[in-house]
Every structure is written in C-alpha cells, then in structure tokens.
C-alpha cells in the first residue's frame, strides 16, 4: 500500500509539472519567489534561470527574464548563502518599470526658494521643490562635480588644500567622493525608496533598489549628480557654483534671502538672493556655524564621534567575514564588516566602512589633516577601510560654548597635521602596536595617496579616544579572529562623522524656532547622517517651504 501511495504521489507531481509546462507555453505570467541560494547561483541571471527551472518546475525556454528585487548575503556561518526576492517573467519581457519615475515640471516663472548647498540635502530639496511647482536657486560654495576632482588631485601633488574645493566642498557634497553608500537605518521605507528611485532615474544602477547595503560607487556618482543638476537647470532652476553664503537677509525675525560672495571671476562680487532659505551647508561648513553663533541664531552643541581610519588588506577581511582562507572567491563581493561595543561608558564603532576602497584626505582648510574613506563601484582595490570612532558627547568637553565640539575637532585635526610633518602626510601606526603602546618602526603599504608617517598615536592623541579604541580593538579581535593584527594600519584622524551642532528647528514645520522662512536642513544642521537620510530631510524641508509660501 505504501509503495502504491508513493507511486501515486510521484504521478501527481509529474502531472503537475506537465501542467505547468503546458500552461507556461500557452500564457504570459509573472511570479515572485523568496529563495535562499549558494553564491554561484545568485551570481548571474543564467544561473538563476537554471535554478528556478529545476526547483520551481519552469520550462527554461519560457523564462524570459529574472529580476532581483531584494538581495542580501548571509555570512553568519561557514556556508554562505544569498537571500533573494526574485520576479520571474514567463513568456514576456518586463516593462520599463525597474524604478518609479518622478515627473518634473517647468518652474521658470514660479516663486523662488534659496537652497544653500548642493550636497544630497540640497539636491533632493531642489528636485522636490520642482515637483511642487517652485523654483530652486542653488548656491554652492565649491565647484561643479568634475572641476572639484582636479582640485582634489592637487592635494596629493602639492600637499595643500583649496578651502572651497575639496573632498567636502563642491557639487555633491562630502558624499560625492566618499563611496556613495546608500544604506540607512531609517524605518520610513516609502521615503527611502523614493530617494533610491530618483538616483536610478538619474543614472544609478537599479541594483541599489535590491541590495541590502546599496552603494553607487565614487566613480559612478559624479555622473548621477551631474544629471540631477541638469534636471534642475532644464526645469528652470538655477545653480550658482563658487558662490558662498556669507549671511542671511533678515526682516525682523523673518529670513527673506541671503548675501553671498560670487568667486567665479578674478574680482569677487557680493550678491543678494531673495526667498525662503533651505540651509543645507553640510557638516564641515564651520564658517556658517561661526556666523550663526555670532548672529545669536539658536543652536545647540551636538555629540559626534572621533577616532581614526583603520585599513586592512581586503583579502584578510574577506577571509575573516566569509570564514574561508580563500577569501571571497569568484562569486562573492568584497566583504564588509560592522563592529560596535561599549568601552568605559562610551560607544565605539566602525563608521563608513569602505570595502575594496581608499583612504582619502578630507581636510577643508590649512593646517589640518582629516581622513575619510571611499570605494569605486567594483570595490576592487587591495584594501578595505573603516572609520573606528569613539562617541563624544557635549558633556565630555569642558565649557558651555555652543561650538566647543567643533573646537575639539579643530584642535585634533591641527595636532594631526603637526604630527604629519605639517603636510597632508598622515600620522599612522600598526593596529597591534597601537594596542600594545609600541611605536611602529615601519608601516604596511597603504592606499592613502599623500603618504603616511609612523607616529605613536597612543601617545599624542587624547586618552579619551585612545584608551577606548584599545579596549574596543581587543573586543573586536575576539569577535573576529585575525582582525586585530599588525597587517592593519590606523591613520589619523577621523573627525567629520557628523555635525558638531544642531540648528534648532520646529518639529512640525521644520522652520527655525525663531526665524521664519529659514529651514535648517540635513546633516549640516544636525538632522541627518548620510546620503539617504539627508535626501529625505531635504525633501521634507522642501515640502515645508512650499507650505510656508502658500501661507504668506
């Protein structure tokens, strides 16, 4: 009887298989599946088609396309799997709906809103204003995204930094040349998806819609930013490069515009621009913070995180994260990591991890050395780096000056410059030597182009930072065998993790708590922490600026 039942079940299964084959040959359809597969299966569409045909009973000839909707890697155990959500197109090709397109209108003769700063907050504010029928007038202190690249190259050649055109200032902001990571902890899925779709509309790969930790790549992002600017211009908006805001124009407690210096020509000109102001100047615009403090415009000190940029050979991180001496192999991407712990009452964590990337010089002025990281789209260099930073709260710095956290940053950056021979050469130390309070007599080959100089970071950096980093590194080394090693090098100093102040605004209308018509925006105002969250905040500020104009 058991054998007969088994034969009956097999017969039923075979009949259903034949039914599916016949149905597929006769009709068009799409189906979605959640699957967990080996990396080689997820590697390309051909492999996925073969897998789905075998596992789901499809005729391979009828599968026209497989679109990956979501992708994440499960590397918690020795056997690595890729979790996928896929859409299978049977007897039909997908429509041109890989991303949701936003319609932008002509706003040539519409009311103006001044957007100060063309980083992600300013760009997305500007595009949202156009959606809402308003005309953005963008003021960017730096150069366009292509020209600023030339100035960044000069940092390595001349060991000097242009204070208006560098890795922080210029079209696209600090994020334009720091990997283009789009991962966010925001739970607001709708706004996050909108930001990603706008990037796709302007040339980013649609893979960012699927990846759990999406990134565009520092080599691809400039073209996307350029396309976003062209949308602004094509719709009747304005973009003014090398135009730095110097002050707000006030009518009592109402902001009606800004004054700015136009530095595009040999003779600088002072210009005035009128309209409500979205202030999206980024976390490194210290002249703006000083102006706001001097003008008694309400702000508060905000905590940041400070530390170093830590660089390992990428193959070592691959071996650790993928539990395999052969590393990532052919089918896996360069490995990422994320570490967090508590040390002496403060959080210590990895920040802005860049697999297969470079460490870059991110100073914005003379006599300072600052590090950051970036990765190309293929994440293909021989190094992987991350900020390793310690939480610094306002109460950790003496005094009640609103700008005391900023002054702490400035002192550490200046000390780093002094330790680097008063150039952009960065002081550095092998990781295990640092933990054991030993000077590194030599340094490993590293990606930091201006060069490294061996330096006892454990000795001259603030003990508030070094003691906590030493404790945290021991913890991370226990969590990931091989992570704490002298193959890794610490490069000082990582200080620009977020804004050192928060410009106070109303929770409901996002306007400054006292000044009507001023909308502090995104990371520079203390309300975002990365490209996506800055973009979301930019869109929200644009919506509130639109509502404000409707009322006046």
Question: Where would I find each of the regions flagged by the language model?
Answer:
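Mature extracytoplasmic/luminal segments of secretory-pathway proteins
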Residues: 5-6
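Short, Lys/Arg-enriched N-terminal segments with co-localized hydrophobic residues
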Residues: 13-28
């Amino acid at each position: 009887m058991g054998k007969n039942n088994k034969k009956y079940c097999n017969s039923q299964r075979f009949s259903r298989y034949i039914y599916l084959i016949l149905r597929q040959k006769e009709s068009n359809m799409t189906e979605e599946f959640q699957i967990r597969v080996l990396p080689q299966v997820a590697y390309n569409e051909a492999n996925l088609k073969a897998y789905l045909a075998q596992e789901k009973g499809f005729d391979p000839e009828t599968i026209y396309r497989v679109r990956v909707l979501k992708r994440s890697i499960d590397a918690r155990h020795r056997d690595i799997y890729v979790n996928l959500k896929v859409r299978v197109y049977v007897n039909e090709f997908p429509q041109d709906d890989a991303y949701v397109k936003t319609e932008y209108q002509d706003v040539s003769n519409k009311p103006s809103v001044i957007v100060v700063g063309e980083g992600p907050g300013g760009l997305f504010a500007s595009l949202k204003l156009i959606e809402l029928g308003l005309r953005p007038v963008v003021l960017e202190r730096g150069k366009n995204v292509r020209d600023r690249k030339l100035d960044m190259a000069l940092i390595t050649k001349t060991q000097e930094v242009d204070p208006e055109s560098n890795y922080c200032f210029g079209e696209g902001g600090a994020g334009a040349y720091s990997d283009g990571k789009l991962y966010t902890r925001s739970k607001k899925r709708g706004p996050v998806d909108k930001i990603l779709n706008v990037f796709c509309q302007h040339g980013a790969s649609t893979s960012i819609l699927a990846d759990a930790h999406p990134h565009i790549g520092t080599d691809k992002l400039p073209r996307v930013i350029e396309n976003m600017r062209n949308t602004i211009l094509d719709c009747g908006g304005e973009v003014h490069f090398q135009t730095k805001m110097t002050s707000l124009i006030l009518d009592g407690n109402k902001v009606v515009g800004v004054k700015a210096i136009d530095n595009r020509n040999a003779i600088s000109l002072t210009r005035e621009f009128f309209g409500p102001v979205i202030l999206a100047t980024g976390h490194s615009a210290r002249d703006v913070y000083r102006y706001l403090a001097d003008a008694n415009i309400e702000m508060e000190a905000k905590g940041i995180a400070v530390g170093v940029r830590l660089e390992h050979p990428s193959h070592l991180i691959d071996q650790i994260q993928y539990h395999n001496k052969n590393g990532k192999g052919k089918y896996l991407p360069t490995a990422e990591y994320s570490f967090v712990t508590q040390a002496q009452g403060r959080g210590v964590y990895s920040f802005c991890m860049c697999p297969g990337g470079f460490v870059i010089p991110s100073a914005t002025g003379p006599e300072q050395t600052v590090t950051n990281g970036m990765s190309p789209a293929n994440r293909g260099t021989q190094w992987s780096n991350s900020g390793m930073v310690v939480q610094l709260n306002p109460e950790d710095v003496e005094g009640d000056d609103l700008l005391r956290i900023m002054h702490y940053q400035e002192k550490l950056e200046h000390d780093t410059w002094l330790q680097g021979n008063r150039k952009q050469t960065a002081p550095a130390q092998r990781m295990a030597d640092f933990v054991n309070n030993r000077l590194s007599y030599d340094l490993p080959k590293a990606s930091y182009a201006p060069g490294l100089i061996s330096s006892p970071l454990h000795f001259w950096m603030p003990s508030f930072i070094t003691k906590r980093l030493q404790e945290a590194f021991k913890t991370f080394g226990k969590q990931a065998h091989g992570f704490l090693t002298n193959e890794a090098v610490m490069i000082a100093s990582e200080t620009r993790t977020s804004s050192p102040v928060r410009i106070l605004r109303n929770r409901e209308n996002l306007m400054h708590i006292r000044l009507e018509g001023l909308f502090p925006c995104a990371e520079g105002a203390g309300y975002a922490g990365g490209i996506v969250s800055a973009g979301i905040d930019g869109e929200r500020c644009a919506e509130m600026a639109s509502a404000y104009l409707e009322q006046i």
